[in-house]
């Protein structure tokens, strides 16, 4: 039986999960409709669609595992279920960060202004950059999967009597946690570097505009600022998400820690829902479609009120 606070946190996290699914489903559907109409999907459309789908899967895995852990913990007892959840989590989590990193690099190469020959070379060969990131993702999986397989094979991670039993030292748990999330750390560092370079590009552009006495409210500056806001929002929200996941991992070592688990879950769900709304507001096509849907819903509501009167 859940306490009042646990019930409140579960309701909040469920609402966040629904918001994340709705927002990311909207992003995926808009891009799929564009593909159906144009018979072609742009790079940005492909990245946004992949990011939205991976976030939907991420939310479904988290919320499903949470409800099973709380209400039907005996379902997590079989070792093959633990192994399946672990593999799915690694694939979806790292794929989600991969798409987010690809999105940030795409914006960076399209918007930033640098004359360095490496930047110019990368800008002309953006497809090679994505292939390199795919290679990094595959290598990350190759490092992560054996760690999970060894943990399960050695019976170091079991679910007994409604609680996880971790049979390893804390130092070993930390090392395994780092190895299984190595790809996440790598892509997150790339995103931090990209955001830093975009800020430098904006600063140089503003100085150039000031020296030419052309003012600051030009289109390039606004695009820079909008993109930096999107990247910074992702960084902040993803840090909160990762903190929530880390709290849930800590719960593996603490018996009867449902309240702490709920708090971690609520924190983790802030990222997929809120950032999808930020992407919708930052993308002109997605924003236009969302406004049309809201206007349609408003018209339907007004029509219903007229029929009732």
Curated annotation (Swiss-Prot):
Superkingdom of source: Eukaryota
Listed InterPro entries: TAS2R
Membrane topology designation: Multi-pass membrane protein
Pfam families (UniProt xref): TAS2R
Glycosylation sites: 161
Intervals, Extracellular compartment: 1-7, 65-87, 149-182, 255-259
Residue intervals annotated with topology Cytoplasmic: 29-43, 109-127, 204-233, 281-309
CDD domains given in the database record: 7tm_TAS2R10
Gene3D superfamilies from the UniProt entry: Rhodopsin 7-helix transmembrane proteins
Keyword Glycoprotein: yes
Subcellular location: Membrane
GO molecular function terms listed in the Swiss-Prot or TrEMBL record: bitter taste receptor activity; G protein-coupled receptor activity
Keyword terms: G-protein coupled receptor, Glycoprotein, Membrane, Receptor, Sensory transduction, Taste, Transducer, Transmembrane, Transmembrane helix
Gene Ontology CC terms: membrane
Transmembrane segments: 8-28, 44-64, 88-108, 128-148, 183-203, 234-254, 260-280
Note in the entry: Several bitter taste receptors are expressed in a single taste receptor cell.
Function statement: Putative taste receptor which may play a role in the perception of bitterness.
Homology family: Belongs to the G-protein coupled receptor T2R family.
Name of protein: Taste receptor type 2 member 114
Gene name for this UniProt entry: Tas2r114
């Amino acid at each position: 039986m859940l306490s009042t606070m646990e019930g409140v946190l579960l309701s909040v996290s469920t609402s966040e999960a629904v918001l994340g699914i709705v927002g990311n489903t909207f992003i995926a559907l808009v891009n799929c409709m564009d593909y159906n109409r144009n018979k072609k999907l742009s790079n940005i459309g492909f990245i946004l669609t992949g990011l939205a789908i991976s976030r939907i899967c991420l939310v479904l895995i988290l919320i499903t595992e949470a409800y099973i852990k709380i209400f039907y913990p005996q379902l997590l007892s079989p070792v093959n279920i633990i192994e399946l959840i672990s593999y799915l989590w690694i694939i979806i989590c790292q794929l989600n960060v991969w798409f987010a990193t690809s999105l940030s690099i795409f914006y960076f190469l399209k918007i930033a202004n640098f004359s360095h020959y490496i930047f110019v070379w990368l800008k002309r060969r953006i497809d090679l950059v994505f292939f390199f990131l795919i290679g990094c993702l595959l290598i990350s999986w190759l490092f992560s999967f054996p760690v999970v397989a060894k943990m399960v094979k050695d019976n170091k991670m079991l679910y007994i009597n409604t609680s996880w039993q971790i049979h390893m030292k804390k130092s070993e748990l930390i090392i395994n946690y780092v190895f299984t999330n190595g790809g996440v750390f790598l892509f997150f560092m790339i995103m931090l570097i990209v955001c830093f370079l975009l800020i430098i590009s904006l600063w140089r552009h503003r100085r150039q505009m000031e020296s030419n006495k052309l003012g600051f409210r030009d289109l390039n500056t606004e695009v820079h600022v909008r993109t930096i806001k999107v990247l910074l929002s992702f960084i902040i929200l993803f840090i909160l998400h990762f903190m929530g996941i880390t709290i849930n991992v800590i719960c593996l070592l603490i018996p009867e820690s449902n309240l702490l688990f709920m708090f971690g879950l609520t924190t983790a769900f802030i990222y997929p829902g809120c950032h999808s709304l930020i992407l919708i507001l930052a993308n002109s096509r997605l924003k236009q479609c969302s406004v049309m849907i809201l206007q349609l819903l408003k018209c339907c509501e007004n029509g219903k009120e007229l029929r009732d009167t």
